Amino acid sequence: MTRVKRGNVARKRRKKVLKLAKGFRGSHSKLFRTANQQVMKALRNAYRDRRKRKRDFRRLWITRINAAARVHGISYSKLTGQLKKANIELNRKMLAQLAILDPQAFAKVVETANAAQ
């Protein structure tokens, strides 16, 4: 069996991890073992939070639409039901943007939805 020297492979692997750990504080960016643990934790959190971000924004949009709808005397759930009946296909993001940036247009949407009832 011939001898296999793996120094270059190990160095490359460690350098890759330390490069990912750049910006971490203290030994978390200097020592391989702690840096490796922190990089794995950071990647795990990033993966989880990319999915969580979608849920968080949906909750935010619903809260904003509900607040704006209640100003016009209607709840969020009633508004969404009436929008479906009126065949108005605005998604939650669009409705939330309208509620904040153009309240008159949002009022028109609510009025149209109420008329279709």
UniProtKB/Swiss-Prot annotation:
One GO MF term: rRNA binding
Function: Binds directly to 23S ribosomal RNA and is necessary for the in vitro assembly process of the 50S ribosomal subunit. It is not involved in the protein synthesizing functions of that subunit.
Taxonomic classification: Bacteria, Bacillati, Cyanobacteriota, Cyanophyceae, Oscillatoriophycideae
Protein name: Large ribosomal subunit protein bL20
Species this protein is from: Rippkaea orientalis (strain PCC 8801 / RF-1) (Cyanothece sp. (strain PCC 8801))
Pfam families: Ribosomal_L20 (PF00453)
HAMAP family to which the protein is assigned, alphabetical: Ribosomal_bL20
CDD domains in the cross-refs: Ribosomal_L20 (cd07026)
Alphabetical UniProt keywords: Ribonucleoprotein, Ribosomal protein, RNA-binding, rRNA-binding
GO cellular component entries: ribonucleoprotein complex; ribosome
Domain of life: Bacteria
